[in-house]
Amino acid sequence: MQGELQFGVAQSDWQYHAYNGTRPDKVKPYDKLRAVFSAHPEPFQIIARKGSKIKDWKSLKGKKVNIGNPGSGQRGTFEVLMEAHGVDTGYFGATSELTSSEQSGALCDKKIDAFGYTVGVPNAGVAQSTDGCGASIINLDTGAVKKLVADNPFYAFATI
């Protein structure tokens, strides 16, 4: 896609990968890329259904988890988190590839136990899950996440 656009919007991790050539699809570095401004932080969150007994990353094991639709920011970040924790989709009881507009309803309807979401705060989809059906944002403060943030300048911790 190099040269096809004059202006675009991207998440900081994908901008970093495009500039440095570190994307998973092995695209060459594009060092003419420039950042104009940062719109707002988009912390990655995992929202767990009330009654699912999910409190942290370890308790996702064996659960029904939406990892995001292919090509989405939440899917990309979820894959990075799985790799950092040394697991793949087999770690979960089942995975789904719902879009961000589908996942809150699926959580409240008990079709999934949790979903990951890379989004600015506040967000209506997260509010639908937390206010509408008692879901909660789980703690992602693990050693693997601490190392991931320390090793990657485009990630930062956020408190919600």
Language-model segments: residues:
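Bilobed "Venus flytrap"/periplasmic-binding protein-like clamshell domains
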Residues: 38-109
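Phenylalanine-focused residue identity feature
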Residues: 7, 19, 37, 44, ...
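N-terminal secretory/targeting leader peptides
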Residues: 1-4, 82, 110, 133
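Pocket-lining segment of extracytoplasmic ligand-binding domains
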Residues: 12-14, 22-23, 89-160
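Short, glycine-/small- and polar/acidic-enriched structural segments
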Residues: 1-61, 66-69
